[in-house]
Regions:
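Helix-breaking motifs and short loop linkers at transmembrane-helix boundaries and internal kinks
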Residues: 47, 79, 100-106, 134, ...
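Cytoplasmic helix-loop-helix junction between adjacent transmembrane helices
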Residues: 110-147
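Extracellular/periplasmic helix-loop-helix junction of adjacent transmembrane segments
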Residues: 36-66, 265-266
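Extracytoplasmic gate region of multi-pass secondary transporters
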Residues: 35-36, 227-279, 367-371
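Conserved MFS/SLC helix-loop-helix module at the cytosolic interface between two early adjacent transmembrane helices
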Residues: 66-102, 289-292
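Cytosolic juxtamembrane N-terminal segment immediately preceding the first transmembrane helix
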Residues: 1-32
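Central cavity-lining transmembrane alpha-helices of secondary-active solute carriers
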Residues: 58-72, 272-284
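Helix-loop-helix hairpin linking two adjacent transmembrane segments in secondary transporters
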Residues: 145-188
Length: 420
């Protein structure tokens, strides 16, 4: 009932804003995970190894910092709302372009361009959401917003299980273009961030009127340098977190398909179950962070992922794998559920539209080769078996998440109503 109470306290404007940001992130993730479910089909179509196909995921992740930088600058300059609309349309169109790639190299280019668009959404959406929502219940909304990523994964799993056999991988990417319609909802129902509007007063003085793009880039980099300590910490933290999520998610459907020879329907069932666990974990741990603190919540969730490894990686029964997956993603996304609020609270007001997303995606860049390395190690050291690689990934990265988090600090309840 407490969860319902948080929503009831929102105004209609705040609800619409949160829904738009949640769906923007969900559908962004949906488009990314379509690739993850189609790895085996792409390998067969383009006559490449799994490790080669995973380069498409690498280029998507590697280009996300550029998107976070460009769209973040745009959000700080012209507003969160129009930037979010452009962002949604862009990632939908590049997803559609992927469906018609005639060769693997062209496919890689479309995925790199998709990565630029994907990289912009999280930072812009999170800034718009948390600058509009009240401070009360921020931990709950942080967990729920981050689990938009899980909802996207869940939708991709449902679509894969029901229509892949009829439309193939190209049809899946065509379906991935449908999120573009969300831009209409943003146009009609969402208002600009009140914090961003308030922050425009200093620009109206004329001091910054007509700034060129390079002057704005220089000003941003100067801001980053003045906050170098927190920026470096956030990048390292996001490297650990992105390795945690992508290391447990990106190759898991391929593990179920290739190592265990499960059908699309069975894979879809397991994916749905563990994403329900992820959704519950993100919301519950996000809410818990309001009571026991951001850092303590992250550390508990990360370390509790380790005991789930035997069921998650070494079971052969569908039911046990589903339980293991549920527990694993409950913890992984439980830790992630704290991040949107934590990063925005730690970020200085003047660069909140850019810094959290840029740090997030820079950390993503550093971890972007993760799935390729996992696939190569499985192919070269374990005869194509993904289980030991997945298991060791969790042990090492969960410990890293806990250690880095413990070394940082938090500003739970910080004022996010101003951008200057």
């Amino acid at each position: 009932m407490e969860f319902i109470g948080h929503f009831r306290r929102l105004t209609a404007e705040q609800r619409n804003t949160f829904i738009a940001c949640f769906l923007g992130w969900s559908l962004d993730a949906f488009d990314f995970f379509i690739l993850i479910f189609c790895v085996s089909a792409l390998a067969a179509n383009f006559h490449e190894k799994v490790s080669t196909i995973m380069q498409a995921a690498f280029w998507t992740l590697a280009m996300r910092p550029l998107g976070a930088f460009l769209f973040g600058m745009m959000a700080d300059r012209v507003g969160r709302r129009p930037t979010l609309m452009l962002n949604i349309i862009a990632y939908s169109m590049f997803e559609l372009a992927s469906a018609f790639a005639p060769t693997f190299h062209v496919f890689l280019i479309t995925r790199a361009l998709f990565g630029i668009a994907m990289g912009g959404e999280w930072g812009v959406g999170a800034a718009l959401a948390f600058e509009t929502l009240p401070a009360e219940g921020r931990g709950f909304f942080s967990g729920l917003l981050q689990e938009g990523y899980v909802v996207g994964y869940l939708i991709a799993g449902l679509v894969y299980g029901t229509v892949f056999r009829f439309v193939g991988w190209r049809g899946m990417f065509v379906i991935g273009a449908t999120p573009a319609v969300l831009a209409v909802f943003v146009l009609r129902k969402v208002k600009e961030s009140p914090a961003w509007l308030q922050g425009q007063a200093w620009k109206k003085s004329g001091e910054h009127t007509g700034q060129g793009i390079w002057l704005r880039v220089f000003a941003f980099l100067k801001n980053i340098r003045s906050h170098a300590g927190i920026f470096i910490f956030l990048v390292v933290l996001m490297f650990a977190f992105n390795s945690f999520s992508h290391g447990t998610q990106d190759l898991y459907p391929t593990f179920l398909q290739k190592n265990l020879a499960f059908s699309p329907g069975t894979v879809s069932f397991i994916v749905i179950v563990y994403n329900l666990g992820a959704l519950a974990g993100g919301i519950l741990f996000g809410n818990l962070s309001e009571k026991i603190g951001r850092r303590r919540t992250i550390i508990v969730a990360a370390l509790l992922a380790i005991p789930a490894i035997p069921l998650w990686a070494y079971s052969h029964h569908v039911g046990l794998l589903a339980v293991g997956g549920f527990l694993m993603q409950f913890m992984v996304q439980g830790a992630w559920g704290v991040i949107p609020a934590h990063l925005n609270e730690l970020s200085p007001p003047g660069v909140r539209g850019t810094l959290p997303g840029f740090a997030y995606q820079t950390g993503n860049l550093l971890s972007s080769w993760n799935s390729v390395i996992q696939a190569q190690v499985a192919e070269n050291r374990f005869g194509g078996s993904f289980a030991p690689v997945l298991a060791w990934t969790v042990v090492v990265i969960a410990a890293m998440v806990a250690i880095v988090t413990a070394l940082g600090h938090e500003q739970r309840g910080a004022d996010l109503t101003t951008t200057s």
